[in-house]
Amino acid sequence: MSLIATRFAPSPTGYLHIGGLRTAIFNYLFARANQGKFFLRIEDTDLSRNSIEAANAIIEAFKWVGLEYDGEILYQSKRFEIYKECIQKLLNEDKAYYCYMSKDELDALREKQKVRKETPRYDNRYRDFKGTPPKGIEPVVRIKIPQNELICFNDGIKGEVRVNTNELDDFIIARSDGTPTYNFVVTIDDALMGITDVIRGDDHLSNTPKQIVLYKALNFKIPNFFHVPMILNEEGQKLSKRHGATNVMDYQEMGYLKEALINFLARLGWSYRDKEIFSMQELLELFDPKDLNSSPSCFSWHKLNWLNAHYLKTQSTQELLKLLKPFNFSDLSHLNPTQLDRLFDALKERSQTLKELALKIDEVLIAPIEYEEKVLKKLDQVLVTPLLEKFKLELNQADFNDENALENAIHKIIEEEKIKVGSFMQPLRLALLGKGGGIGLKEVLFILGKTESIKRIEKFLKN
């Protein structure tokens, strides 16, 4: 059995989106699981549409999610001489030919075919041309497709695909300026790179018969194909930017962890029993492209957030501090290591993303400027004021290094005053955080410390 070799081959005409990353992950997993090779190829032959920023963004996205490719990145724009040699070889062997049909002639032909309700296609008029070429026309090069032959391949997801060559026209492999076309360069590079398995979106399925024609014409070995169904939104429509089809790096800015995103995308179109959470090692052990679903998968923000929340909970304090560096939040330098641990232990249980975690840090560490109106209205000032004044005295005596002592101080007020828990907890929470919800009060007191806790209570009483 030959060494497995896969590739991911994006065009740098736009940023890497979520569907592209999923394809890259599938190729990466299959290669690495079989101790094979995984290559990154930048398909930049369309010089008019290429973007250096887009190419760099693809590489940046790979670095972020940790998809390591083998060897150097292959840029198609640096391989034009190789493509020219292959085109000339096909011309020399009478497997391709120059076509002098002008754009106007081709447009006129297509109009006639539309009127006759025929499929618009080239009519092979220059296929066996031996005469004098017309002046003023820069020819394209077309492949000479064998007539009335059956192209048959077994797609790893779609099953057997059969196409008669009569359904194909002699498509262009080199434009009039000499630049090669997409299907041609893809075939050349996949063959010369030794790609054994092509895993790509099923929007490429219609290209496959054309590429097989080229593989055969050039005596190249045909790889295995797996055409993955697209990702749909939750309404069953094509994924749009609003529903997740956005730049991969936007997910980092939104506070998603790479582990969660990889897990999420690997599960979009692939499954293993009822298991939802997979480490990279588990994915490498279990993934097989033959298990990919033949029907489209649905993007779910709810599922992504659920997975991200899971992975967020597994991060240590030091790991979270590193991950939070790109986000703006309150200074933490005044907190000791134990306070930091309590802050993150409490908040990561209530956060789905790093961005949300950063906001919740501010909610605890920034003293409230105003207080939640609907909670404030429910409080009886006559009862609340003496309770908080008495609690201040308890806090002055409490050991703020002992969370149990802080909890005891809270319950002492409740027991001595013979009041309901909520009757004291609500005003205390409002004084400390400015709102009616949040993490446990003993944690808040421990994290804020004695001076800040008392300061916030005094400020609340003044208001």
Swiss-Prot record:
Reaction it catalyzes: tRNA(Glu) + L-glutamate + ATP = L-glutamyl-tRNA(Glu) + AMP + diphosphate
Biological processes annotated in GO: glutamyl-tRNA aminoacylation
Short motif ('KMSKS' region): ranges: 238-242
Entry's EC annotation: 6.1.1.17
Positions annotated to bind ATP: K241
Keywords: Aminoacyl-tRNA synthetase, ATP-binding, Cytoplasm, Ligase, Nucleotide-binding, Protein biosynthesis
The organism's place on the tree of life at top rank: Bacteria
GO cellular component: a single term: cytosol
Motif ('HIGH' region): 10-20
Transmembrane residue ranges: none
Coiled coil spans: none
Pfam families reported for this sequence: Anticodon_2 (PF19269), tRNA-synt_1c (PF00749)
Subcellular location: Cytoplasm
Top-rank EC class of the record's enzyme: ligase
An annotated Gene Ontology molecular function: tRNA binding
Family: Belongs to the class-I aminoacyl-tRNA synthetase family. Glutamate--tRNA ligase type 1 subfamily.
Function: Catalyzes the attachment of glutamate to tRNA(Glu) in a two-step reaction: glutamate is first activated by ATP to form Glu-AMP and then transferred to the acceptor end of tRNA(Glu).
Quaternary context: Monomer.
Protein name from the UniProt record: Glutamate--tRNA ligase 2
Species this chain originates from: Helicobacter acinonychis (strain Sheeba)
